Curated annotation (Swiss-Prot):
InterPro entries recorded: Chromo-like_dom_sf, Chromo/chromo_shadow_dom, Chromo_dom_subgr, Chromo_domain, Chromo_shadow_dom, Heterochromatin_chromo-domain
Top-level taxonomic group: Eukaryota
Subunit structure of this chain's protein: Interacts with histone H3 when di-, or tri-methylated at 'Lys-27' (H3K27me2/me3), or tri-methylated at 'Lys-9' (H3K9me3). Interacts with Tar DNA-binding protein homolog tdp-1; interaction may maintain localization of hpl-2 to gene bodies. Interacts with histone H1 his-24, probably via interaction with hpl-1. Interacts with chromobox protein homolog hpl-1.
Alphabetical keyword list: Chromatin regulator, Chromosome, Nucleus, Transcription, Transcription regulation
GO BP, one annotated term: olfactory learning
Species whose genome carries this gene: Caenorhabditis elegans
Protein's UniProt name: Chromobox protein homolog hpl-2
Function: Seems to be involved in transcriptional silencing in heterochromatin-like complexes. Probably does not act as global transcriptional repressor, instead targeting a subset of genes. Involved in RNA processing mediated by Tar DNA-binding protein homolog tdp-1. Plays a role in linking epigenetic regulation with the innate immune response. Involved in the endoplasmic reticulum (ER) stress response via modulation of the unfolded protein response (UPR), acting mainly through the IRE1-XBP1 pathway and perhaps, to a lesser extent, through the autophagy pathway.
UniProt xrefs under SUPFAM superfamilies: Chromo domain-like
Location in the cell: Nucleus; Chromosome
Gene: hpl-2
Ranges of residues in domain Chromo: 19-78, 115-172
Biased composition (Basic and acidic residues): 99-109
Length: 175
């Protein structure tokens, strides 16, 4: 991003505390259909980043710039429409084609193709399942189901759990 990304912006909470926005990390559509932004707070670790609706933020220029950059990298690829060739007797069963398409759609469900996982920032329990907060090499962060992260990035998951593991000496308990 340009030099504007280093600007500081404010958010005010009801207690009149002012928090400075260091960086906008990601964007999503919230439950109410409103745009929410993943905010990196100045003076706080990235693990304290939070999703905030636009109306809670006073950093209009920073949000507009992020949206311009976000729209550049999120443009859909247009496909040319051509006539489909007549099916031949050699072609595979249409049911098999549907299964393959379904499998491909599952792989693209989280839009992770080509993304390199930089690190796992945290772990949380959502409704019914665990989710990892993952940071990618392009400095975006996403909350993903643990099943998806376990299958795509198993070594990173092990590394994350190892970093959180504490081992106690059983002999120390006897003293």
């Amino acid at each position: 991003m340009s030099s504007k990304s280093t600007k500081r912006a404010k958010i005010e909470d009801p207690k009149d505390n002012v928090f400075m926005v260091e960086k906008v990390l990601d964007k999503r559509t919230g439950k109410a259909g409103r745009d929410e932004f993943l905010i990196q707070w100045q003076g706080f670790p990235e693990s304290d980043s939070s999703w905030e609706p636009r109306e809670n933020l006073q950093c209009v220029e920073m949000l507009d710039e992020f949206e311009r950059e976000f729209s550049k990298r999120e443009k859909p690829i247009r496909k040319r429409h051509s006539q489909k060739p007549e099916p031949s007797e050699d072609q595979a069963d249409p049911e098999e084609d549907k299964d393959e398409k379904k499998e491909t759609n599952q792989n693209d469900k989280f839009s992770l193709e080509g993304k390199q996982l930089k690190c796992i920032v945290g772990l949380t329990k959502g409704p019914g399942e665990l989710h990892f907060l993952c940071k990618f090499s392009d400095d975006t962060a996403r909350l993903l189901p643990a099943k998806e992260v376990n299958s795509r990035y198993p070594s990173q998951v092990i590394r994350y759990y190892e970093s959180k593991l504490t081992i106690q000496d059983p002999k120390a308990d006897e003293l």
